[in-house]
């Protein structure tokens, strides 16, 4: 019974039940300025499943500093979006290039806890993140680099838009 269990520990337990030979390491604390460098530096890839803007921007900045690819996905209500940020890829922007919010805007960005989210929307976004992770880690297929995939759950439609780096971006630009 995992109802009261931490979701990272629950996911680890489930993963081990599927494959008892794998090693799973969980981090159950909050991602913050104090631990961000240590958490990101030793990884080949980060999959962002956060639910607030402030943490997303921190994950983006730290991943860019450490040159670690980041798979960003978000879901609010019935809508979702996903893209990959790969610091070494010429065509790759970062999160702040696409969503140039400032710290003052954090409270204005909709979050799942305030706006709600349909469970199937998070399931779809998670499945797409998994596919992108496999493509990046195995270097197969065409990852969503320089492309933002939008999902509209009410019409069951996907829209892809091109996104590019902002030369004035405070995270990845030259400005």
Region annotations inferred by a language model:
Residues 1-175:
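Adenine nucleotide-associated cytosolic modules
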């Amino acid at each position: 019974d995992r109802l009261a269990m931490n979701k990272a520990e629950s996911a680890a337990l489930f993963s081990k039940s599927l494959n008892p030979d794998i090693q799973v390491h969980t981090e159950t604390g909050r991602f913050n300025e104090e631990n961000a460098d240590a958490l990101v530096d030793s990884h080949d890839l980060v999959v962002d499943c956060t639910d607030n803007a402030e943490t997303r921007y921190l994950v983006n900045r730290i991943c860019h500093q450490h040159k670690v690819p980041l798979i960003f996905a978000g879901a609010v209500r019935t809508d979702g979006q996903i893209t990959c940020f790969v610091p070494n890829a010429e065509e790759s922007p970062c999160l702040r290039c696409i969503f140039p919010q400032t710290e003052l805007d954090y409270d204005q960005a909709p979050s799942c806890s305030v706006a709600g989210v349909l469970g199937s929307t998070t399931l779809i976004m998670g499945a797409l993140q998994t596919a992108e992770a496999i493509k990046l880690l195995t270097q197969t297929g065409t990852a969503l680099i320089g492309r933002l995939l939008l999902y509209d759950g009410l019409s069951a439609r996907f829209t892809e838009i091109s996104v590019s780096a902002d030369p004035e971006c405070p995270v990845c630009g030259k400005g």
